[in-house]
């Protein structure tokens, strides 16, 4: 399997740091951007660069790619990341892609591995929440109130799971160990194994009278609200960790974390690539031929731009510092203005005569057979 192709697309070594990968991505992205490079195949190259960076910029995906190639990066060899679910979801209990081996041994030996103290504190599950941002909100940052459901300690029993006035007792069957010994006949002979206690289900505690609110779980679902300060310059797919805002822990363990994933809406005016912003500017062919000073919209407000005479479609001009804020760094990126010359469709008589006079002065025959046409002059 080829697990170096993504590095080759960006032109970096397999041991490159994240800063080196990001720098190379910016360079290659500009090189093949469809608005800046009109060569055949440039758009495909641009997509390949995007695909490579999406994987190599994520440490989990990169590790999977380094080990298994493209199949690993796409999730073909076990879990990683957040999946594609919107809203929120739990993260606990993931076992990767090799659970089958464990299942085989469990069928013989009752679930091997090191024994875990059932009464040990355990951190609660992590949650995920997706925030939709407008284009400008992602550029300048914003505060959002996020409301979601999470598991908190039961307000009635305080997390014990027992009815008020009672308390959990040590399990009578396993003696608080959470495991019981079982003798089994296996293909290897009669063997004594350990398995999870069927009374306390591994907790080591037995609740005689369950709490009427949480029914013995010690947790209850509660609507929870948290303020999220979205930093300026975030992009789709980036995530933010809010410590302690996930589900409640077990046996006094800490709360899990909330991971906020950003989804940025597209702009009907601008395109964005990291801190760089692109704007396609329609321009009359007379302005392009004679040159002009025009107003250009940016996310920071309109600015004036001088267009030199003879400007062609596809020409681009850089407005330094008029891009998006750099999330990891200082200052802003740049805005690139890509010129798109518009040919008039409906002209009045005066306009037609003016163009015919121009054609005559240029020695161009615009009609008739076998003679140069107006646009042949530029071929």
Swiss-Prot record:
Q: What is its main location?
A: cytoplasm
The record's GO CC annotations read: cytoplasm
Cellular localization per UniProt: Cytoplasm
Q: Name one GO molecular function term.
A: zinc ion binding
The record's remark on the cofactor is:
Binds 2 Zn(2+) ions per monomer.
Instruction: Enumerate the residue ranges forming zinc fingers (CR-type).
Output: 141-223
What is the annotated role of this protein in its UniProt record?
Participates actively in the response to hyperosmotic and heat shock by preventing the aggregation of stress-denatured proteins and by disaggregating proteins, also in an autonomous, DnaK-independent fashion. Unfolded proteins bind initially to DnaJ; upon interaction with the DnaJ-bound protein, DnaK hydrolyzes its bound ATP, resulting in the formation of a stable complex. GrpE releases ADP from DnaK; ATP binding to DnaK triggers the release of the substrate protein, thus completing the reaction cycle.
Q: By what name is this protein known? A: Chaperone protein DnaJ
Q: Which organism is it from?
A: Lactococcus lactis subsp. cremoris (strain MG1363)
Q: What is the lineage of its organism?
A: Bacteria, Bacillati, Bacillota, Bacilli, Lactobacillales
From the UniProt record, report the name of the gene that encodes this protein. dnaJ
């Amino acid at each position: 399997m080829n697990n170096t192709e993504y590095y080759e697309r960006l032109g970096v070594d397999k041991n490159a740091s994240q800063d080196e990968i990001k720098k190379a991505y910016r360079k290659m992205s500009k090189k093949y951007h469809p608005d800046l490079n009109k060569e055949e195949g440039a758009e495909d190259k641009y997509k390949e660069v995007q695909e490579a960076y999406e994987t190599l910029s994520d440490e989990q995906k990169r590790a999977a790619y380094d080990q298994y190639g493209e199949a690993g990066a796409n999730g073909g060899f076990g879990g990683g990341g957040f999946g594609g679910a919107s809203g929120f979801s739990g993260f606990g209990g993931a076992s990767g892609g090799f659970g089958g081996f464990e299942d085989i041994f469990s069928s013989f030996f009752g679930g091997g591995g090191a024994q875990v103290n059932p009464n040990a504190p355990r951190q609660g599950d992590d949650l995920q929440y997706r925030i939709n941002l407008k284009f400008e909100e992602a550029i300048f940052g914003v505060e959002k109130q996020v409301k979601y459901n999470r598991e908190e300690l039961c307000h009635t029993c305080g997390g014990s799971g027992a009815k008020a006035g009672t308390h959990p007792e040590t399990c009578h069957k396993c003696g608080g160990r959470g495991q019981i010994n079982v003798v089994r006949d296996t293909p290897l002979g009669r063997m004594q194994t350990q398995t999870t206690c069927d009374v306390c289900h591994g907790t080591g505690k037995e609740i005689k009278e369950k709490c009427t609110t949480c029914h013995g779980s010690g947790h209850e679902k509660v609507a929870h609200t948290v303020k999220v300060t979205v930093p300026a310059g975030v992009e789709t797919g980036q995530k933010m960790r809010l410590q302690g805002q996930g589900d409640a822990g077990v046996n006094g363990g800490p709360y899990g974390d909330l991971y906020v994933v950003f989804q940025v809406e597209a702009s009907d005016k601008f395109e964005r690539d990291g801190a760089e912003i692109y704007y396609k500017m329609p321009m009359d062919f007379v302005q392009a031929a004679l040159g002009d000073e025009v107003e250009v919209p940016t996310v920071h407000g309109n600015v004036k731009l001088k267009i030199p005479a003879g400007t062609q479609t596809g020409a681009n001009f850089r407005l330094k510092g008029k891009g998006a804020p750099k999330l990891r760094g200082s200052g802003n990126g740049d805005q690139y203005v890509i010129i798109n010359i518009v040919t008039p469709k409906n002209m009045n008589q005066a306009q037609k005569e003016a163009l015919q006079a121009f054609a005559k002065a240029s020695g161009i025959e615009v009609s008739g057979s076998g003679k140069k046409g107006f646009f042949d002059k530029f071929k």
